[in-house]
Amino acid sequence: MGKPQTHQHAVDTNVSHSPARWVDGEISEGQLPDKRLDRRLRQVFDQMGGAMGQSIPRACKDWANTKAAYRFFSNDRVSDHAILKGHFVATRERVTSASGPILILQDTTEFSYQRERPEQIGYTKSVNSGKDDTGRWRHHTVCGLLMHSSLAVTISGVPLGLTALKLWTRDKFKGTAALKRKINPTRVPIETKESYRWLENLRQSNELIADPGRCVHSDIYELFSLAAELGTNFLVRAQNNRLACGGTHTVTTELADQPVCAAQVIEVRHDKGAVMPVTLDVKFRTIHVLPPIGKQKTYKPLMLSYIHAVERDEPTDRPRVDWKLVTNLPVHTAAEAIEKLSWYALRWKIEVFHKILKSGCRAEDVKLRTADRLTKLLAVFCILCWRVFWITMSSRDGTAAAEVDLTGIEIKILDRVVPDKPSCPADARNLAFYAIKLAKLGGYLNRKSDPPPGNIVMWRGLNRLTDIALGISIAAELVGN
């Protein structure tokens, strides 16, 4: 096979990949029960990753590959956990290589689907659909899946990967609203609640990372107690005004007596998209917190640090910023309180991850008919979306090498297709450098006034890079023949 030599950035089609494909770093050998399934999983990643947001038939391009993908997702020997197993291992390696505290962000999201037979998938909620002729509210159930995910990020906001993932549906709605009015939810055993998944993900994340002291998790008292048992840390936004001291006070009354110790300026985005700075008055206090009354025989009181940050001036066009955070980390100074506020501000990263799933992969547009098949496809989407998010954030961090996520042929393609600036130093060719080139393929202009590239231009660039690589591969075969 001939090698073009006419340009300093000519693409060498014989360059070996390092790794062979990016996905090889996210798939463990033998993680599926059959080598053929391992090969098919890699092929599914290549196909879906090269056509993010497209349907399975369009990504697979022909009936044979489409049918093979359908069979893979229908295979009883394949599970969503098996698909994610290699990614969990890779996440652990990235966490080990990173320095400083690791934030484990947890959140739940919904995926809704329109199906002729919704019972094959399940339901997420019951909603009002207007009134009938007699004026009574009509209810209908929404077909879909729920996903609770845990994402490891550095304190600079770089996503290192998923540490735990749970997918499920709901099957009981009738009478639940009336039941909530009759019982005290704090007296119900946590094991019977959906919120138990927060504890399950906390435990799985700590087992995976194997260094719980570095982890900070994102207002369940059982989570507080489990964190103490596992020797890990948490930082959450408090939702409940818990009993404090001997039960004669609450957390709110304890904080009310504290003076403001610092001011912190943050940026707030309006509904219309405009960003403006606001000043928060910050105070903190370490408080002896009691468990809920119905669970005081099961759980012990805890010494927790509360941080209250409230917007100094009452706005007229939006709700006032009012954060009340609770953590088992020590908070003795104003600087430590502000540090925890900056950590909590990173919580939106997991919301961005879920947005990539729905907007980039268009996870709610897929046509698979059963929950079992959908969960496996969503597991694939999660890894693809993490990669987009990882490259996007790496474009703002100049420490990672390009070979960490891009293959040799991909690097050469970017060098050939996206010209360098004359002043570009040779030693600056890291992942951040090539991420900008990748974003340019997706339409990013890289002007001085432009913000850093976002996820949309990044996945467009990845799709285009895949098409260019395919064209080069076909051209090389034609020349060779």
For each feature predicted by the language model, list its residue ranges:
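Single, function-defining residue in the core of a domain
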Residues: 2-132, 141-146, 151-481
